[in-house]
């Protein structure tokens, strides 16, 4: 998979000054493969955590932990593991962020939540910008409360 333009390839080839251990929740869908390739090109160690259903043959040399955020004990594969950075991609349900934050708060230095799904109300419009209407799955006060809880769980 070639995710980089020619101009970007030069940047991608530069090694990071300090290699990091990066956990990517998801990693094989829409944006994850680009993150994985970039991190690997910089010399980082990448671990994927997902259900193993979407593009499971991608990245054969990357460690893959299997887990399901929809079931009790779905994060068990992460127990006892430490990471410098966690990138959380496949969030469709707010409690997933809360639960992941609670599981990982003592074992990671940085937790990055990336929302790539259903952020905007219209899926029909081409050229959506930050000024367009956001899609709220809950009324605004509930979203505010959930955001506060998520920040607290993540430490």
What are these regions (language model features)?
Residues 1-16:
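N-terminal twin-arginine translocation
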Residues 22, 28, 55-109, 113, ...:
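NAD(P)H-binding glycine-rich loop region in Rossmannoid oxidoreductase-like domains
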Residues 14-16, 38, 56:
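A generic structural signal for short, solvent-exposed coil/turn residues
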Residues 99-155:
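Conserved Rossmann-fold NAD(P)-dependent oxidoreductase catalytic core, especially the SDR/UDP-sugar
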Residues 49-53:
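N-terminal Rossmann-fold cofactor-binding loop
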Residues 21-42:
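N-terminal Rossmann NAD(P)H-binding glycine-rich loop of SDR-like oxidoreductase domains
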Residues 45-46:
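Short beta-strand element of Class I
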């Amino acid at each position: 998979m070639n995710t980089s333009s020619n101009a970007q390839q030069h940047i991608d080839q530069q090694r990071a000054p300090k290699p990091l251990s990066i956990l990517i929740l998801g990693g094989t869908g829409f944006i994850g493969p680009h993150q994985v390739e970039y991190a690997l090109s910089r010399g980082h160690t990448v671990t994927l955590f997902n259900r193993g259903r979407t593009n499971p043959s991608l990245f054969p040399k990357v460690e893959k932990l299997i887990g399901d955020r929809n079931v009790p004990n779905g994060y068990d594969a992460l127990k006892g593991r430490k990471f410098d950075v966690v990138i959380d991609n496949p969030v469709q349900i707010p409690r997933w962020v809360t639960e992941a934050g609670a599981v990982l708060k003592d074992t990671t230095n940085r937790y990055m939540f990336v929302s790539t799904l259903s952020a905007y109300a219209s899926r029909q419009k081409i050229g959506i910008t930050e000024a367009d209407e956001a899609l709220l799955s809950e009324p605004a006060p509930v979203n505010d409360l959930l955001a506060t809880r998520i920040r607290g769980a993540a430490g």
